[in-house]
């Protein structure tokens, strides 16, 4: 590689980094304002880099506030591998929770056992092929296979998302949810289960209430 090519590549990198830093600064200012925002860019444009910069800023500037209130910032990403990458950058006791959408949805709804039991036992959509709804005492989600065993109804992956949507339509649940998760970051939001995104927009973003996204 000759010197001219090397200098040209270095110049392009510097320009790209300067532009990325400007965008990151704009994102931070939006975070400070409390308004929700969306970052749209093509593959390889640095969205993941920006996400990591935002996470670093939140961890450095919001620790005392969110930790004192026992609140969590959630970073929803598409794969478990991406969750692991983000987790490696966080302090062990961080209030930032990287998660897939399925894990996040289940953590948000799992304590509402009465609602879950009532819903799955009155709706054939959740019936396991090898069981019935008699004497369901608990609803849980582990490997994503739907079956019933020893009074426990195990949910399919999409069951969790649908039940989360149903609870998001409940006003009381939304109040509790918003208080627990004041900020939700969604990586690759266009690949996230659309009914959930629609509810985030309709119940929170359009009404300018609840979590910041």
Which stretches of residues belong to each language-model region?
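P-loop NTPase Walker
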Residues: 1-114
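Accessory N-terminal region flanking or inserted into the helicase ATPase core
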Residues: 1-45, 50, 115-188, 193-200, ...
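Conserved RecA-like helicase ATPase core segment
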Residues: 57, 202-213
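Structural motif corresponding to the C-terminal cap of alpha-helices
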Residues: 59-63, 168-172, 204
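Short helix-terminating capping/connector loops at secondary-structure junctions
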Residues: 65-71, 178-179, 208-212
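Short acidic/histidine-centered micro-motifs embedded in hydrophobic/aromatic stretches
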Residues: 104, 180, 203
């Amino acid at each position: 590689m000759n010197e001219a090519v090397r200098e040209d590549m270095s110049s392009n990198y510097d320009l790209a980094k300067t532009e990325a830093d400007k965008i990151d600064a704009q994102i931070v200012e939006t975070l400070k304002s409390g308004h929700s925002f969306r970052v749209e860019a093509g593959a390889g444009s640095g969205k993941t880099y920006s996400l990591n910069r935002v996470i670093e800023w939140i961890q450095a500037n919001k620790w005392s506030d969110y930790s004192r209130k026992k609140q969590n910032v959630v970073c929803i990403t598409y794969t478990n591998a991406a969750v692991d990458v983000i987790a490696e950058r966080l302090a062990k006791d961080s209030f930032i929770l990287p998660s897939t959408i399925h894990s996040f949805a289940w953590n948000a709804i799992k304590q509402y056992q009465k609602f879950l039991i009532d819903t799955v036992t009155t709706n054939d959509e959740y019936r396991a092929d090898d069981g019935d709804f008699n004497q369901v005492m608990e609803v849980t989600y582990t490997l994503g296979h739907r079956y019933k065993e020893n009074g426990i109804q195990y949910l399919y992956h999409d069951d969790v998302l649908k039940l989360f949507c149903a609870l998001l339509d409940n006003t009381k649940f939304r109040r509790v949810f918003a208080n627990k998760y004041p900020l939700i970051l969604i990586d690759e939001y266009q690949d996230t289960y659309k009914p959930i995104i629609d509810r985030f927009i309709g119940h929170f973003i359009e009404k300018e209430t609840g979590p910041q996204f």
